[in-house]
């Protein structure tokens, strides 16, 4: 489950790029037919198809940050999927309060590229969606 693979390394690099506002660097992991799913209740909820739509979505979302980061805490590989458990701590440009929480992103890979990028409001939801249990004791 927790292991280093080419996909987990690519994701680690992608989040590093996102945190320094390098959108093009973040986009390197995606296949041309990428599908982005952001859940209801999130500021930019919806489904986005293709590189340009996903790039615009990510650029708009990242553009709201005044400061902060999305820090991967764990990468869990399950067949063609990688669950990324994240600690998100950001302050948006239009707020003084910090957003601080944990969520789960799930990436589905084909031929070394992500074909789907789905976010879950709760890490456990991401794990359940791919059918794995979090066996780590916190």
Predicted features, each with a name:
Residues 1-10, 55-138:
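A beta-strand edge to alpha-helix "cap/lid" segment located at domain peripheries
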Residues 6, 21, 49:
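Residue-level signal for the nucleotide or nucleotide-sugar donor/cofactor binding architecture
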Residues 18-21, 42:
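Conserved short acidic donor-positioning loop in nucleotide-sugar-dependent glycosyltransferases
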Residues 20-37:
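Short, well-ordered alpha-helical segments enriched in acidic and aromatic residues
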Residues 35-49:
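A short gly/proline-enriched turn/hairpin at secondary-structure junctions
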């Amino acid at each position: 489950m927790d292991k280093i693979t080419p996909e987990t390394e690519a994701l680690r690099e992608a989040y590093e790029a996102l945190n320094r506002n390098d959108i093009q660097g973040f986009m390197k992991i995606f296949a041309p037919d990428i599908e982005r799913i952001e859940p209801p209740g999130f500021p930019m909820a919806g489904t986005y198809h293709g590189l340009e739509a996903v790039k615009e979505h990510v650029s708009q979302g990242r553009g709201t940050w005044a400061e902060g980061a999305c820090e991967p805490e764990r990468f869990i590989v399950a067949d063609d999927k990688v669950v990324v458990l994240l600690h998100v701590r950001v302050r948006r440009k239009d707020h003084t309060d910090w957003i601080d929480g944990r969520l789960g992103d799930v990436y589905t890979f084909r031929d070394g590229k992500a074909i789907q990028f789905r976010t879950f409001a709760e890490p456990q939801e991401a794990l359940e969606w791919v059918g794995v249990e979090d066996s780590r004791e916190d």
